[in-house]
Amino acid sequence: MVPVIALVGRPNVGKSTLFNRLTKSRDAIVAEYAGLTRDRQYGEARWQGRTYIVIDTGGISGDEEGIDAKMAEQSLQAIEEADAVLFLVDSRAGMTAADQMIAEHLRKRNKRSFLIANKVDTIDPDLARAEFSPLGLGDALPIAAAHGRGINHMLQEALGIFPKDNVEEEGEGEPASEEVAEGEEPTRIPGPSEKDGIKIAIIGRPNVGKSTLVNRMLGEERVIVYDQAGTTRDSIYIPFERNEEKYTLIDTAGVRRRGKIFEAVEKFSVVKTLQAIQDANVVIFVMDAREGVVEHDLNLLGFVLETGRALVIALNKWDGMEAAERDYVKTELERRLLFVDFADIHFISALHGTGVGHLYKSVQESFRSAVTRWPTSRLTSILEDAVQVHQPPMVNGRRIKLRYAHLGGANPPLIVIHGNQVDAVPKAYTRYLEKTYRRVLKLVGTPIRIEYKGGENPYEGKKNSLTARQVNKKRRLMSHHKKAEKKKKDKRR
């Protein structure tokens, strides 16, 4: 499971700066959930092939009232959700009473914590270590978040306590280890899902019908193999079979009785949701058709898109809507979900089972699209046809040239295109290529990523050397030029 690391500390010690440094300010996957987690930000980060989730919290000063007390409460909740805590202190300001209070709380919770002395760019790191040693959390790790100093050592220490089972491997967004032979048919890249079947995460806002859908999918007509508790918090991994196909449901809403079709008010956990997305092969995103698309839905869909997971969208509670309401919702979906237009959309009633069975076909197609690989000849042929129909634009009087393409990875498919001036390819042309590959390869339910690589200039940095013929020509020209200059001088005399 993907580790979760919380950044805590009093206000203005550099938590947000460190958060942006770790997540590389990837705004598309950083979400603020109004009302639910108004003072926590969640972001995905990667370091040396390892993926982890970072929580940025509000500051704790110890004398909070009103909304500040809510901020402190959110920070303490983040500590409970996290697997490890990075406790930031300000080296310039020195140790404060608030620092001592936070350290005491961490010791009581027996939470794996790392003391991080920030802003050491103008202070001796040894002095910072000595200053904060009374906190009783071990030696402080000195960093300067604003300049990136000490970050690698800090991550080495913090991530070193976790097993390396979340390092990205083949079939999980990394390049495939072997090329598809020319003329070979497209094949699936085997992944961890072969044993437990396709891993499906059912996610969505609270009270959209996730629990009802889980119970419907695990109904009595299905063969449930066994129930196995997840390794992190309350997520439950439930392997089951349907039509002799294996699946594993990742249920973030906790254990519930089979056959109890009731959607209680859930306690929404962002961490469990993000971890389920990371661990899944396919995400079924559930929305309430009566409420339409809200901002929170877009935030979660953005995270799914950034992680590259295959996606199926389910509009629940469709059965009780009037025709005019349905038309309006469909119009809104077309307008607001353009960025995930590759995903199948199903209109279902989890309570009555209407349309639920059709989800499995989309899950299968999405997974197959995400893990299929194609030979270089096939991808290059599609590229050549696309360029012939619509050529890349001119840059500085020269046409961008795209020469060949090959598969760089799967889940999601990564297509690497080689050519000249590729750094100038417009985003609109990249979208055109994505749609072309999606149409020709008949890809459904998975994002596509295109990466460009330019050819190296073999003469870059080298001085041109003239041939013997060019040297003789240069001599003749220089001789002719000198004679002409001499004649001009003679005439002036």
Curated annotation (Swiss-Prot):
Chain intervals with Basic and acidic residues compositional bias: 454-463
GO BP field: ribosome biogenesis
Residues at which GTP 1 binds: 9-16, 56-60, 118-121
Record's protein name: GTPase Der
InterPro entries to which the protein is assigned, alphabetical: G_ENGA, GTP-bd, GTPase_Der, KH_dom-like, KH_dom-like_a/b, P-loop_NTPase, Small_GTP-bd
UniProt binding sites for GTP 2: 204-211, 251-255, 316-319
GO molecular function (one): ribosome binding
Domain annotation KH-like: ranges: 372-456
PANTHER family per record: GTPASE DER
Native organism: Pseudomonas aeruginosa (strain LESB58)
Region (Disordered): 167-195, 454-493
Biased composition (Acidic residues): 167-184
Record field: compositional bias (Basic residues): 471-493
Domain of life: Bacteria
Role played: GTPase that plays an essential role in the late steps of ribosome biogenesis.
